């Protein structure tokens, strides 16, 4: 090997060439993460390719050894896996990292909600929200996220505090993370004209064309959905719902959302998050709901880590259910399904770091997304990108040279370890970003340096 070529010999040895033009030799990629086919795939859905990077773009992807790249610098990947950057379609960066200040006393959903409401009223000033959002985004960026959608608590005075903060963050992170946001409030608030006037004003000024609400079985659910859909139609907005985050099989608002979309022939994207109770319904009822979801064209996002933490929790009793939706049945019906981070170090989930590699690893374990493994790779990349209307989540010729390089050579190596030594590549260059130190948040919690 000549001196201009790099080798992958240790966790700290992978170094991309300083030149703007180089080749990644014998790189293992999942066929489902490529923009176009490039050679044969093995039983797990992987293929070996060479990738030519030219001034921040992917100039060529070809079967390994098919092209002579000449004397340009090379990285000998030796069958290590490259992934597209992640897309995290369901997060809550406005409430992230408040655990030190406000814990969930018993770990269930009701206590989480009460704790967040108390902390929001007492502490969520613009500087507080901004600091926690920034910390969250720095974490996501360091881990290899290209795009992120957050839900923003939008009730009372908080609406006018948090949305301008989000808009400033979105502008500050432009070109690094593509940010979107959806308002979060219970469906009953749609019936309050004053509340909805505030929501419309904030989304007009600071939003990203997405309207949302939390749906559950309340007496005026149909009226609330009718008004919400009508506003979205008038404004040309997409919809993003929190749906049936419950262990009650009678929680069936997902069917109501799907039926409303079909009835109104709603033409914009709709995403439904959680949908936990679907997994606990009788087979006939579940099938009817899934058929409606597929017919309406809804996307469904499961939040495996948070839902496993909250659902079926009773003090002193072992959980009988993992808390997640019927994701396999939805996928089999043709529904675009995806997984995302959800809450991070707050009363709804005291763990997590907006690391989609962790979300993927845990999602595979919790949801059995491994037979076949390759079929589920788009759930953390291409499918959430499509749900956000973005041309991201795949490796393609002509696209940006944005990817994650790992030392893993198959799916068991990829998921057995946290890939802490991954190399995040953005525009052809290795990113130097690292997750921020938790001590940076100490001032928010009155902790001495």
Task: Identify the meaning behind each predicted range.
Residues 1-69, 411:
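N-terminal metal-binding scaffold of metallo-dependent hydrolase/deaminase domains
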Residues 65-83:
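Active-site metal-binding motif and surrounding structural segment of the metallo-beta-lactamase
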Residues 80, 99-151, 157-172, 198-204:
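Alpha-helical scaffold segments that flank or form the walls of functional sites
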Residues 80-101, 246-247:
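Di-metal (Zn2+ and/or Mg2+/Mn2+) metal-binding site signature of metallo-dependent hydrolases
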Residues 96-129, 207, 235, 253-271, ...:
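Active-site gating loops and adjacent loop-to-helix segments of metal-dependent hydrolytic enzymes
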Residues 161-175, 191-299, 316-339, 393:
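Histidine/acidic residue-rich metal-binding segments in metalloenzymes
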Residues 238, 259-270, 310, 321-406:
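His/Asp/Glu-enriched, well-ordered alpha-helical/loop segment
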Residues 386, 397-449:
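C-terminal cap of metal-dependent C-N hydrolases
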């Amino acid at each position: 090997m000549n001196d201009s070529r790099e080798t992958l010999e240790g966790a700290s040895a992978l170094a991309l060439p300083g030149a703007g033009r180089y080749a990644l030799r014998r790189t293992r990629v999942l066929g489902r993460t490529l923009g176009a086919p490039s050679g044969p795939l093995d039983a797990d859905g992987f293929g070996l390719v060479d990738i030519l990077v030219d001034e921040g773009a992917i100039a060529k992807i070809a079967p390994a050894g098919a092209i002579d790249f000449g004397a340009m610098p090379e990285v000998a990947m030796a069958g290590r896996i490259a992934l597209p950057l992640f897309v995290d379609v369901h997060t809550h960066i406005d409430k992230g990292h408040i655990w030190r200040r406000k814990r969930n006393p018993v770990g269930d959903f009701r206590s989480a909600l009460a704790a967040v409401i108390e902390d929001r009223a007492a502490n969520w000033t613009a500087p507080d929200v901004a600091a926690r959002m920034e910390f969250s985004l720095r974490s996501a960026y360091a881990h290899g996220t290209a795009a992120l959608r957050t839900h923003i608590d939008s009730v009372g005075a908080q609406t006018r505090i948090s949305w301008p903060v989000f808009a400033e963050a979105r502008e500050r992170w432009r070109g690094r993370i593509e940010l979107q946001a959806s308002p979060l409030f219970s469906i009953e608030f749609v019936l309050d004209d004053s509340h909805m006037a505030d929501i419309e004003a904030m989304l007009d000024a600071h939003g990203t064309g997405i309207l949302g609400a939390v749906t559950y079985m309340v007496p005026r659910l149909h009226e609330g959905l009718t008004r919400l859909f009508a506003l979205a139609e008038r404004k040309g907005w997409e919809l993003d719902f929190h749906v049936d985050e419950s262990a009650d099989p009678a929680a069936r608002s997902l069917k109501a959302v799907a039926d409303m979309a079909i009835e109104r022939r709603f033409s914009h994207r709709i995403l439904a998050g959680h949908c936990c109770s679907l997994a606990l319904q009788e087979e006939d009822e579940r099938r009817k709901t899934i058929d409606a979801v597929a017919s309406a064209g809804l996307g469904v996002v499961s939040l495996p880590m948070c839902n496993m933490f909250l659902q079926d929790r009773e003090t002193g009793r072992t959980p009988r259910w993992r808390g997640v939706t019927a994701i396999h049945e939805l996928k089999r019906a043709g529904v675009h399904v995806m997984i995302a981070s959800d809450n991070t170090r707050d009363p709804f989930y005291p763990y997590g770091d907006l690391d989609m590699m962790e979300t993927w690893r845990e999602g595979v374990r919790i949801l059995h997304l491994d037979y076949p493994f390759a079929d589920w790779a788009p759930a953390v990349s291409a499918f959430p990108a499509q749900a956000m209307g973005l041309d991201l989540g795949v490796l393609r010729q002509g696209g940006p040279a944005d990817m994650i390089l790992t030392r893993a050579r198959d799916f068991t190596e990829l998921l057995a370890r946290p890939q802490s030594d991954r190399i995040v590549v953005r525009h052809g260059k290795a990113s130097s970003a690292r997750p921020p130190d938790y001590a940076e948040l100490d001032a928010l919690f009155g902790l001495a340096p």
